[in-house]
Amino acid sequence: MAELATIARPYAEALFRVAEGGDIAAWSTLVQELAQVARLPEVLSVASSPKVTRAQVAELLLAALKSPLAAGAEAKNFVQMLVDNHRIALLPEIAEQFEALKNEREGAADAEIVSAFPLDGADLDSLVASLERKFKRKLKPTVEVDSSLIGGVRVTVGDEVLDTSVRARLASMQAALTA
């Protein structure tokens, strides 16, 4: 996975530089759409077929997009470059790295919150507000429920993990008692 990230990084950075000259949010939507299309096994199959020309693959990808940017020269050139270099399968990773660059520019970060119980609006807002103070940046939360945590939450922001779950505390106590 690390090597995919290494290969995808220059593409994401180049696209982000293009996006900085316009609407970054619109480019983010475009790259997310491209990533969704590239995840389809049928698209990867067509892209690797020797019977289909590179221009046809690029046209197929662009035709599947709803974004108005897809008609622009920059988007067409980007897609054609990916097709020519056999990098269509990298689009999900490129999209992920593009989002990371966008978040960095906005002073924001994605936060993965795993809770033992479902979080409703007020509880989630309160938790996100306190996490934003702790991490000193705007967070974009995604919430999952995992009852095996027993209680509490586990929050992942970038490479930082804050685990206040009962399961983690029990594991810590067990480690302390057996040491």
Curated annotation (Swiss-Prot):
Does the record carry Transmembrane helix as a key word? no
Q: Topologically, how does it sit relative to the membrane?
A: Peripheral membrane protein
What would be an example GO MF term here? proton-transporting ATP synthase activity, rotational mechanism
Say yes or no: keyword Membrane present: yes
Question: What are the record's GO terms for cellular component?
Answer: plasma membrane; proton-transporting ATP synthase complex
Keywords for the protein's UniProt record, in alphabetical order: ATP synthesis, Cell inner membrane, Cell membrane, CF(1), Hydrogen ion transport, Ion transport, Membrane, Transport
Name where it mostly resides: membrane
Q: Which domain of life is it from?
A: Bacteria
The places in or outside the cell where this protein is found are: Cell inner membrane
Role noted for this protein: F(1)F(0) ATP synthase produces ATP from ADP in the presence of a proton or sodium gradient. F-type ATPases consist of two structural domains, F(1) containing the extramembraneous catalytic core and F(0) containing the membrane proton channel, linked together by a central stalk and a peripheral stalk. During catalysis, ATP synthesis in the catalytic domain of F(1) is coupled via a rotary mechanism of the central stalk subunits to proton translocation.
Q: How does it assemble?
A: F-type ATPases have 2 components, F(1) - the catalytic core - and F(0) - the membrane proton channel. F(1) has five subunits: alpha(3), beta(3), gamma(1), delta(1), epsilon(1). F(0) has three main subunits: a(1), b(2) and c(10-14). The alpha and beta chains form an alternating ring which encloses part of the gamma chain. F(1) is attached to F(0) by a central stalk formed by the gamma and epsilon chains, while a peripheral stalk is formed by the delta and b chains.
Task: Please report which protein family the annotation says this sequence is part of.
Answer: Belongs to the ATPase delta chain family.
The name of this protein is ATP synthase subunit delta
